[in-house]
């Protein structure tokens, strides 16, 4: 592990960044742009902070942090992002809130864990663009569903035809969204095919019955092409498939349950994949039929989701496509 002399906490917003060195109680407020980053370098120089021996801790913000991360990579500064909820839950009782105070607490969080910190991998521009495209595709799909509901409700309530102005406009919006969605999906495939390893892994996981293009794209994006999770179980926890104990002392003896702290979008897509796998995979169908005799369907569905995750990670590790060789016993 690289020895870091300074751990800085950075609270990033759309227009500004707040930087704090909790150990020395030093702080800086700057713009989230090139001028602000230059101000940060000068501040470090004024306080004898060696950036080559500095570790920066910041939160995931959904995109506002990318410019600062690009600056860190250009200056060869080690950094790591953490979920905001993880840092928030580590603080204990907190009163009041400000960007400066948040930066101080982020720095404290990093200093307490400095011996266990590992730098993040450099940003992968293809993965970053893939996530952006998937997010925009999701927005288009939701808009389309909204316009479809408008058409359906209007026809039901007012008994109007396709010549109605609102229905015609909504129909035009739906057609435009379909065209844009097709363009987005074409760009996604173009992006995946441009990376040989990414495209091979995509072909591997979509060879599994139940894993279609959307699940394939999202799995590639959120596992960063199977590099950001050490194994299938860690990814299953992230998605919210692994059940955890719910018991304490003698009074609380609940059943194991999955956590609400999960990537809900991935879980939802895997839910659909599990249903399709049960329908079209003889092995999964036989498993579901056997377990339905004494298990709840939701539990079986969750188990199938975990099996699909295990298959994806196992096949990618071996570099092999899925081959259906299940034979049902007579």
Predicted stretch roles:
Residues 2-22, 106:
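Gly/Thr-rich phosphate-binding beta-strand-loop-beta motif of the actin/hexokinase/Hsp70
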Residues 24-50, 55:
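Nucleic-acid-processing active sites and adjacent nucleic-acid-binding tracks
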Residues 52-64:
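Short glycine-rich phosphate-binding loop at a beta-alpha junction
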Residues 79, 84-204:
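Long, charge-rich intrinsically disordered scaffolds of nucleic-acid metabolism proteins
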Residues 99-110, 269, 273, 308, ...:
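Stable alpha-helical structural segments in soluble proteins, enriched in small hydrophobic residues
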Residues 113-118, 224-228, 276-283, 311-324:
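Short helix-capping/linker segments at secondary-structure and domain boundaries
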Residues 207, 213, 219-299:
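Phosphate-backbone recognition surface of nucleic-acid-processing proteins
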Residues 288-330:
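Low-complexity, acidic/Ser/Thr- and charged residue-rich accessory regions of DNA metabolism proteins
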């Amino acid at each position: 592990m690289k020895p870091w002399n300074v751990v800085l906490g950075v609270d990033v917003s759309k227009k500004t960044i707040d930087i704090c060195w909790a150990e020395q109680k030093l702080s800086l407020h700057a713009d989230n742009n090139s001028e602000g980053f230059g101000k940060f370098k000068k501040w470090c120089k004024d306080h004898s902070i060696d950036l080559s021996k500095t570790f920066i801790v910041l939160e995931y913000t959904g995109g506002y942090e990318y410019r600062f991360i690009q600056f860190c990579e250009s200056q060869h500064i080690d950094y790591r992002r953490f979920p905001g909820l993880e840092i928030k839950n580590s603080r204990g009782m907190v009163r009041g809130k400000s960007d400066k105070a948040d930066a101080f607490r982020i720095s404290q969080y990093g200093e307490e864990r400095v011996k266990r910190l590992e730098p993040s991998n450099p940003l992968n521009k293809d993965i970053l663009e893939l996530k952006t495209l998937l997010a925009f595709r999701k927005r288009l799909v939701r808009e389309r569903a909204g316009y479809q509901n408008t058409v359906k409700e209007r026809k039901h309530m007012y008994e109007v035809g396709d010549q109605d102005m609102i229905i015609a406009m909504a129909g035009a919006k739906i057609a435009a969204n379909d065209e844009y969605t097709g363009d987005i999906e074409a760009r996604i495939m173009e992006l995946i095919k441009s990376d040989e390893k990414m495209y091979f892994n995509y072909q591997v996981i979509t060879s599994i019955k139940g894993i279609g293009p959307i699940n394939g794209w999202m799995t590639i994006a959120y596992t960063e092409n199977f590099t950001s999770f050490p194994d299938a179980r860690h990814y299953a926890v992230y998605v919210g498939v692994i059940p955890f104990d719910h018991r304490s002392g003698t009074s609380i003896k609940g059943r194991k349950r999955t956590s609400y702290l999960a990537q809900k979008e991935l879980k939802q897509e895997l839910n659909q994949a599990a249903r399709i796998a049960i329908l079209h995979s003889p092995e999964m169908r036989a498993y579901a039929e056997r377990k339905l005799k004494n298990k709840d369907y939701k539990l079986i569905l969750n188990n199938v989701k975990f099996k699909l995750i295990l298959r994806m990670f196992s096949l990618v590790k071996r570099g092999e496509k899925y081959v259906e060789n299940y034979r049902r016993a007579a």
